[in-house]
Swiss-Prot record:
Changing N891A: No longer prevents plasmid transformation. This strain encodes 4 CRISPR-Cas systems; this is CRISPR3. This is CRISPR-associated endonuclease Cas9. InterPro entries: Cas9, Cas9-BH, Cas9_PI, Cas9_REC, Cas9_RuvC, HNH_CAS9, HNH_nuc, RNaseH_sf. Mg(2+) 2 binds at D31, E788, H1011. The gene is cas9. It comes from Streptococcus thermophilus. Has 2 endonuclease domains. The discontinuous RuvC-like domain cleaves the target DNA noncomplementary to crRNA while the HNH nuclease domain cleaves the target DNA complementary to crRNA.
Amino acid sequence: MLFNKCIIISINLDFSNKEKCMTKPYSIGLDIGTNSVGWAVITDNYKVPSKKMKVLGNTSKKYIKKNLLGVLLFDSGITAEGRRLKRTARRRYTRRRNRILYLQEIFSTEMATLDDAFFQRLDDSFLVPDDKRDSKYPIFGNLVEEKVYHDEFPTIYHLRKYLADSTKKADLRLVYLALAHMIKYRGHFLIEGEFNSKNNDIQKNFQDFLDTYNAIFESDLSLENSKQLEEIVKDKISKLEKKDRILKLFPGEKNSGIFSEFLKLIVGNQADFRKCFNLDEKASLHFSKESYDEDLETLLGYIGDDYSDVFLKAKKLYDAILLSGFLTVTDNETEAPLSSAMIKRYNEHKEDLALLKEYIRNISLKTYNEVFKDDTKNGYAGYIDGKTNQEDFYVYLKNLLAEFEGADYFLEKIDREDFLRKQRTFDNGSIPYQIHLQEMRAILDKQAKFYPFLAKNKERIEKILTFRIPYYVGPLARGNSDFAWSIRKRNEKITPWNFEDVIDKESSAEAFINRMTSFDLYLPEEKVLPKHSLLYETFNVYNELTKVRFIAESMRDYQFLDSKQKKDIVRLYFKDKRKVTDKDIIEYLHAIYGYDGIELKGIEKQFNSSLSTYHDLLNIINDKEFLDDSSNEAIIEEIIHTLTIFEDREMIKQRLSKFENIFDKSVLKKLSRRHYTGWGKLSAKLINGIRDEKSGNTILDYLIDDGISNRNFMQLIHDDALSFKKKIQKAQIIGDEDKGNIKEVVKSLPGSPAIKKGILQSIKIVDELVKVMGGRKPESIVVEMARENQYTNQGKSNSQQRLKRLEKSLKELGSKILKENIPAKLSKIDNNALQNDRLYLYYLQNGKDMYTGDDLDIDRLSNYDIDHIIPQAFLKDNSIDNKVLVSSASNRGKSDDFPSLEVVKKRKTFWYQLLKSKLISQRKFDNLTKAERGGLLPEDKAGFIQRQLVETRQITKHVARLLDEKFNNKKDENNRAVRTVKIITLKSTLVSQFRKDFELYKVREINDFHHAHDAYLNAVIASALLKKYPKLEPEFVYGDYPKYNSFRERKSATEKVYFYSNIMNIFKKSISLADGRVIERPLIEVNEETGESVWNKESDLATVRRVLSYPQVNVVKKVEEQNHGLDRGKPKGLFNANLSSKPKPNSNENLVGAKEYLDPKKYGGYAGISNSFAVLVKGTIEKGAKKKITNVLEFQGISILDRINYRKDKLNFLLEKGYKDIELIIELPKYSLFELSDGSRRMLASILSTNNKRGEIHKGNQIFLSQKFVKLLYHAKRISNTINENHRKYVENHKKEFEELFYYILEFNENYVGAKKNGKLLNSAFQSWQNHSIDELCSSFIGPTGSERKGLFELTSRGSAADFEFLGVKIPRYRDYTPSSLLKDATLIHQSVTGLYETRIDLAKLGEG
């Protein structure tokens, strides 16, 4: 074989050809997203340069001229959650197996004398008969004894009870089976210390719940006869009846109240806390649901962690009630109450099953067969086979039995959830390990009389069951594990019996602390505080208090609380009660200062923050003086830190023992039982460590006393007059040792893996662009970062909340307008209709003009104005809070800023009614009535506008910092950075506004160019602004600080307002003011100091339009080896998670064995093998029965599983696949790009490792449309989500253009997509296009409004093919791309990260030379 001639190519080549140095200055624009980075290079005249780029490879093409404009696309980064869950499960199963092996080790000698093949038979019990090493009967090795055993002990619990209660000598094999079952399924460890079935105290748990409930909800519920409650929960009645009976024990509590919802949870029903906490959406919780923890976390995200304790106590009570149900048995003498309960459940199941079978047999044979024989239904056959869960089985039975008489017995038991219960159910999770231990001890005590080794090893056997590795010690892996941190005293194998001697628990706990605590977002070297740190809670309280304002009778305007008032409120209220309300503040201001008619702002009913930890510690320590003494702060913080980090009571006691000279034992005992969860986002150093250089104050000092400024945290850290901003930026500078490893630096940034991947790729792009420009650094780099998708429940449901809000608020107002006034074009009002702002505002304003009070005509809404309360010149706020619907914007009065004082006086009463009904917010009301308080101050206006321009998100600042330190690493004589490259961050709203002003429409569905276009526009806007106003640099350029007496300081507040509001106006020829006036601006904008031309409104705008019309944009899909597969678009592991049954005879199904030694043809295995990459192999194979040697050039998929073996010996791996005389191997990561001879492009997504004739091929061409079609599609996409007639009118006036567009797309399909059958289907469907409505035409071309579907562009868009509907005709997914199609006259193209460098390999020429 010609090994010496084989060439192996990994397409990861170094494009190191030296480029000619760029002589002109240039800038780079970046648009960073979670799965794309758009980039652009611009010169000082806003043009995008092009370069003749050299092409490597074996094709005749040596140079290609390319525009320096492009986009890198990549699969979004994912979290490690999936890996972590699998890793945790593997550890759990391994440790369970080890426990069984420890037990077998103890039994081995004695067992060998009785039955030396016993353990072997057990290990082989799941093997098919041919693979068993001994008898197929696992316990006794013969049929007779096996049958007797199963007759006597139908379940393992029958055996456990027998052994626990019997004084007779039992077969040692049976003793082992019982103990192994307990050790394998040993229960939870939530209850510490001794516990048995007789001290499962429901009454105590209920009192604990009541105490916590009373403390949190400031209630005084009590129950004199708690025995009565226990009787109710143990009674054989439905859960609903239990809840109702318990509620009657508390006469003052309503059935619709929050206490009632908690009772629902406690008895095992579902509760909904939406109304209780005044939430906009359903907040359902159910203790038995697998998603309970996740659901609770979501709810606490809305209502705050202060409520977590009451849910914890409710869950404990629920578990105690469940457990009491298990342990309630009639045999009081048994030492195995759990096993007795399970036997009772088994017997009831058997009896009820016989009754049910008899009952259903009388209905019909067909029904009987469906219920008991058809496992595809939710009947008994599916239920007992595990395919149907208990809940679905009960629903199925209830629907079936409800039609017939005489089924009351079954239905009542179903309502109690006590019908045909299995041995293993979800509520087994409420059984603590102590219950199993109780039965284990009973068995060991009885059988130790006959087997002395059991007495000798009793403690060791019990230790196997009771031992668990403390979570703070973590995984026990040795070496360089990424996931282990345990520290050892000795290097030997760890067992349950030597754990304390081998593991250094204290040191491991310290390592755990360091690992668990994350770093401050602002001071990356500092660890964050616990969420319940007293310092952190104090900071949050003052941060909230500092923005509270009040007004009272005889006062002209709202005023902030002063320092004394804030301190008083904290001392008198926050330290006196857990929840402080607006009424408390009003009471204080009235009682101390005598104010009347007080109204507050900055608080809604109650404060979000509290000093809950202060109250917890006060209850435990009972020493207010100690808590209030600032010298004890370090002690208190250390205690809270320990109670947050650790859950293990013993470790908490150990760490708190250092305070024995301060607190007595009872206090330390109570402290050890307290546990906190969660971490804050800030460190102690940030809150109360770093100091302002002038005043010497910390941030907390300023929050407590800031004179008349009353700045909150965000204002303090961004205020240029204070030194916090500078110190934070200094703390974020990367050390020299880190700069070389940019990947690790990005990895350490806060934020999701998705956004970090975008950041890393953007830095690579910048590096390559600098190389393309011959090494010359850019003048500036402009960064815009996309906001990540929010997957919170609130984010998902916002679009569905408008109708609910209106119904509730209009009812409060006493208006029937929602039912009585419906536009003629609509049959009903729904959430989709209310996405139209005009319609929504109409109802929010109760059908009135907001400024005049005149009635508005619901069928003429498009004729009215939407006025921005704060003009857009100051604030680009398009939220409903800043909009009103009016017959004319001029009706706001004489004021250019806000509704005039005259308007306010006339309309304030009406606005106040809307406020009280929650149809408008407090913020909206305040802005409407701003004229009463003098309108906007010039400083406010300047601040408004500045915030619209400058990006303030921390993650964007981190990116700017990375780029700044990369390019500006030289220092001057004062050790300050010399900035030769300006790193500029602008808000995305500027590009959006620019696009809107000049009709530069973005339609994402067409192609991927829009990412590059956004990057280009960012660079253009930033360049123009800084040319026009060079002294603006301190506002936009990272690392620059405004100097004293700077440009900003010299300008008066009024000048600043005018200046800021006109910034974006430099691009316009004229400006329309709110009062209707139009101001003309010069054609050419110049820098007033230098006279340099900055922006020519004709030629420069023409340049922008020309660039956005370039058909050549460098689009690159990042090639990657896959480390995980995909299952329905979601990440999966090496294969599908669930085992598949063994394949049918002669099946071609390929499965991975569940274990290496298990043949999947006998035992089944895992399907859906995930592929990592493919290789292109040139060699020979033997074909047919005659094994004819045939030359081949074909793909071979390499699975993630096989990747290691392939890397070890690539040639040998392929030889084992059947290849011979291998001449060439080309490695092809996912998304490798091929160009066919007709110009069509394909991306290789995957080749099946099990069948190299099958794979997934994606489309790779980008369709380009002229601006005429882009504009048509922009309006078409918006035609149905608004009553605004402009979109519809435009489409109606240009309807004919759809025909031209359709045939253009059809031609593109013919030339580049190749879905010719689909083309004929589409052509046939289009012949009747004139007969279809405008709405159907639009949704067919560009996809339905609010949908991610692309309509006709599903045919042309990059990526995998998808089916879609066009003018009522279903167009199937095009499936004709085959791996072999890429090998006919194809060129393999490897692109660099920008796509500017290419290596092209003509596959037809492989082997030539």
